[in-house]
Each structure stands twice: as structure tokens, then as C-alpha cells.
Amino acid sequence: MFTDYGLNGPYVGQLHAVVAYVAPDAPAIDLMHDAPARDPFRSAYLLAALAAEMRPDSICLAVVDPGVGGDRPPIIVSVDGKRFVGPGNGLFEILQRRSSRAKAWSIDWRPEKLSSSFHGRDLFAPVAAMLARDEWPTCSPLGEGWREDPGRPGANWPDDLAEAIYIDGFGNVMTGLRAAGLSERAKIEVAGKLFSRARTFGDVAKSQGFWYENSLGLVEIAVNGGSAARQYGIEAGAPVALRN
């Protein structure tokens, strides 16, 4: 499960309750529930990075849905054997763009009771659980042209996002830039500060800031023994620049 619901309150528990009822034998894993709130744009880059570590037959219930109850379609996206269920608001744009084998379906199935404000519980969770039982709800294929439609949500988003997209509990600042291919000498500028590359925390002095390739393959700003976000005043959405 990947959502922006947060762990406080009743929302995540209700997702688990639905999945456990519909597919009691399917393990449900909380991937993260503090995705960028009401922000499918930045969440799309985070989800794409996390998806690379999922096993090929995974089913991911992913909900960052500020337009819940509106006209955005509910969809299933299959990417390299992994299936994602959630809103068609661009949340799956980056992961499908990075794959040569992506298909999508619009979900036609509807439950008897559908809250206008909680499609995660009433629509997406049951569909994800059905897929976990090898059952397909009523769907309509979006066809081969859906990936080329310039009007689809997220069509104009960049392949890599030069912004801070997530700040973890340690104050490390994850960006939407992939580290693969960047020079060892490349510097990252954010909040008016230039950061050099290091392999890991112990390679720099205490309280020193640096950037490194994190476990998801993204550029991350960190401080050895401290919080990069607090020390340098970096917030989610801060622009990031690559300097050679």
C-alpha cells in the first residue's frame, strides 16, 4: 500500500480491513503512508523509485487522490508484471513511462456503496484484493494509444524531477533525480548550498552535508549525524540543480 493518508486516524486500517475481508490469504504490506500529501505529481516519482524494488507479481494499492469523487478515472496499470490500482491522475505516469511493457485499464466495476470521498476503501482496495485472488473486476482496456495521449494527466511532467520530493524522519532530503549516470564529481545545489558526492555517511565529517545515491537509486541530500532539512532549511518542493 502506498498512500498519503498518514498512520494517524482510521483510513489505513480501513484499507487493511477491506483487503483482509476480500482476500484473507493475501499479505498486505504498508509500503508508505506519508507520500507527499494531495500531491500526485511528486508522489509519482517516489512511487516509480519504490516500484523498482517490488517483486514482479506484486499488486500495489496506490492512492494519492486530491480529486477523489471527481472525473479522474479509476485505473489499473500493469508495468513489467506489477499491477497498480488507483486514480488516473498522473500518479502512475512516471513508472509506466520508464517501462517498455505497460498496459492500462479503466475500472468499470463499482461497489454497491461508494463514498464520494473514500474511493481508497470502497473502490481501489476491493479491486486490488480481487487481483490478489486472481480475479479481474469489470474493466475496459485503454488501448495502445493511451501512453501517447498528450492530454493524459502527467503527460508534460519531466522524466526526472529536479526538486526535493520527500523528507524522511532523519531529515534526509530525497529528490526526484535518478543518480545513475551522474559523475562522481557532480555537485548538487539546493537552498543556495553546493553538495559534493559521497558514497555514504561515514565518508564525510560529522555535521557535513553531502549527496549520495540512496537505496532507491535517487539523489539524496544528507548530513552525517544530523538533519539536512533542518540544517539547510530545505523543504519539500525546493528546486534542485545539477552542477558539474
Locations of regions flagged by a protein language model:
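Surface-exposed interaction regions enriched in Ser/Thr/Asp/Glu
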Residues: 236-244
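A conserved acidic, glycine/proline-rich C-terminal tail/linker
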Residues: 174-235
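Active-site histidine-anchored catalytic micro-motif
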Residues: 22-28, 39-45, 54-57, 61-64, ...
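Alpha-helical scaffold segments in soluble metabolic enzymes
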Residues: 14-18, 46-49, 94, 126-130
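Anionic-ligand-binding alpha/beta catalytic cores of soluble enzymes and soluble regulatory domains
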Residues: 111-177, 181
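Residue-level marker for buried hydrophobic side chains located in beta-strands
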Residues: 1, 60-62, 165, 221
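N-terminal glycine-rich anion-binding loop in soluble enzyme alpha/beta folds
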Residues: 1-34
